[in-house]
From Swiss-Prot:
Function of the molecule: The RuvA-RuvB-RuvC complex processes Holliday junction (HJ) DNA during genetic recombination and DNA repair, while the RuvA-RuvB complex plays an important role in the rescue of blocked DNA replication forks via replication fork reversal (RFR). RuvA specifically binds to HJ cruciform DNA, conferring on it an open structure. The RuvB hexamer acts as an ATP-dependent pump, pulling dsDNA into and through the RuvAB complex. RuvB forms 2 homohexamers on either side of HJ DNA bound by 1 or 2 RuvA tetramers; 4 subunits per hexamer contact DNA at a time.
Binding site for Mg(2+): T66
Protein name stated in the entry: Holliday junction branch migration complex subunit RuvB
Cytoplasm in keyword set: yes
Gene name of the encoded protein: ruvB
Amino acid sequence: MARILDNDVMGNEEFSDRTLRPQYLREYIGQDKVKEQFAIFIEAAKRRDESLDHVLLFGPPGLGKTTMAFVIANELGVNLKQTSGPAVEKAGDLVAILNELEPGDILFIDEIHRMPMSVEEVLYSAMEDFYIDIMIGAGDTSRSIHLDLPPFTLIGATTRAGMLSNPLRARFGITGHMEYYQEKDLTEIVERTATIFEIKIDHEAARKLACRSRGTPRIANRLLKRVRDYAQIIGDGIITAQITDRALTMLDVDREGLDYIDQKILRTMIEMYQGGPVGLGTLSVNIAEERNTVEEMYEPYLIQKGFLMRTRTGRVATQKAYRHLGYPYQNT
């Protein structure tokens, strides 16, 4: 069952994300360091009438990597063609996409770390020298065809930058690290979304939503919609701080943005293993979740908020986790 705090896109959220997507850097809320850098790089490329260097965007899900790719295309005034690593299964799939590019176009590859190595290798010459050599036919009848490509910009997005090969990573001239959002930026995003969807919300309610959104706009917007539902049925349709607290309590989202699964992880470590260290496999069995799910979906936020530490001997619940859940802390 999907969690309301999942970073991945749910249901019809792809349409919602497009509706809310800013078009230009001046409209993009948050990620100030990345925006400042890109504003300079984009303007320099435009003045030289050149394609922008290839861009790698990396960071946790839901932080606006896809949105930033579209913003870059709009700022440059060029077309963007979109695909994903898993969708490009064969080298021929990528060649077909590259062959359709016009001068200056952007090719956006989401989840680029999941692209097969045989496909990735086609990108090397395409990115560096704007050509590809492909083999057609088989056996004695096979031959190589050289295809020149127009200058283009590849934007790759990944949640797992460490999984990129060194040759691919080295071909990106620009990198953008998308970080978790600050409370003030998320509050502004909640208020902007409320305005677009004509939802009535006061500032304190928006701030409370932002505090519990795990630093992620996608989660903030999802929680806003669920609190709106609660306000319409239980209240008078206006989202107040009190309504927000009651709705999020009903949804099992606490003041730190932890849900019942996050709390279950920490409680299991504290109650059964004296806070740890606990091996990932042992922890996964105890909470009935897959190892990868625990490592990729739950742990990053718990670590970022200081509730959990990864050590060489296993996972350890911090003093902050004890305090947050109301357990006495014993420093052994």
